[in-house]
Each structure stands twice: as C-alpha cells, then as structure tokens.
C-alpha cells in the first residue's frame, strides 16, 4: 500500500509540474517516469533507454528519454550526479534527503555510503535563509581492490630491484 501511495504521489508531482509549466502530459513521459522509479541505484540515460526497450518493451528515441529526464530533474523526482567526466549518473530522488557515495579514484567504482553519521552532522548545520531539500556527499579515495593491486605491483618492483 505504501509503495502504491508513493507512486501515486510521484505521478501527482510530475503531473502538477507538467500542467504548471504548460507541458504535454504524454504517455512517453509517464513511461520514462515509471522506468526511472524501477531503476536500482545510479543509472545513465543510456541505461534507462535500454531498460525501457528490454524490460518494458517500450521503444522511445534517446532524445525523448533525455528530454523526459530533464523534466524529472527539474521537478525533483530525479537527481543528477557528475561523478566522472564520462557521463552524468541519475538516481530516483523522490522522498530522499541524502545521497552519499564513496568513489575510487583509480577504477571509478562507486559505492553507496550507508553510515548515518553524515546525516546527523548535516541535521545540526545552521543554514540561514536556506531550507535545504537534500544534500550530496562524494568521498574520493582508493578502493580495497585497487589498493591490493597497487601493493602487489609495488612488491613486485621491490623484489625485482633486490635481484
């Protein structure tokens, strides 16, 4: 029941946005909204397009997907993440107040951070004349896998130099 109510809320928010901005309430836009809600975690526009074609058997042009994503960003249903120079990642944002990720500087692996410490810290921050809706935090470093590879490579170099 709660999921259905939340889905109805999202559709209502999107419909209100379209009406208030004099935009067409097309089936394609609502299908993109539905697909975005079914995506797990971060996704690219190309991945959303592929999902629409392969999982929902709904064929849209990439341009329609991109323009619908733009509308979903503008009304706050999606949030965009510029995590690399390659492309923008999107995430379903409705009802969320924080987006926290650890990003490996070597391989680019992106992992969600589930620690609530940041949430508690942000909740006590005073922001005069600003009521914040959400926040994003990106922590960059080297993941355990890349650290092991680096250590292994360093050991090989040291062993080679000893000979």
What residues fall within each predicted segment?
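Intrinsically disordered, low-complexity serine/threonine- and proline-rich regulatory segments
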Residues: 1-38
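Ser/Thr-centric signal marking residues that sit
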Residues: 26, 44, 64
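Short capping segments at the starts of secondary-structure elements
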Residues: 38-44
């Amino acid at each position: 029941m709660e999921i259905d109510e939340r889905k109805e809320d999202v559709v209502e928010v999107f419909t209100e946005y379209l009406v208030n901005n004099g935009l067409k309430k097309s089936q394609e836009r609502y299908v993109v909204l539905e697909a975005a809600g079914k995506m797990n975690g971060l996704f690219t526009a190309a991945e959303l397009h592929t999902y629409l074609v392969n999982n929902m058997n709904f064929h849209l042009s990439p341009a329609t997907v991109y323009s619908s994503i733009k509308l979903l960003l503008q009304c706050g249903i999606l949030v965009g993440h510029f995590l690399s120079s390659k492309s923008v990642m999107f995430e379903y944002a409705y009802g969320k107040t924080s987006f926290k990720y650890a990003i490996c500087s070597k391989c680019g692996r992106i992992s969600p951070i589930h620690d609530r410490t940041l949430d508690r810290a942000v909740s006590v921050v005073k922001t005069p004349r600003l009521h914040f809706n959400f926040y994003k935090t990106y922590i960059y470093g080297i993941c355990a896998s890349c650290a092991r590879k680096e250590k292994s490579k360093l050991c090989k170099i040291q062993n080679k130099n000893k000979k």
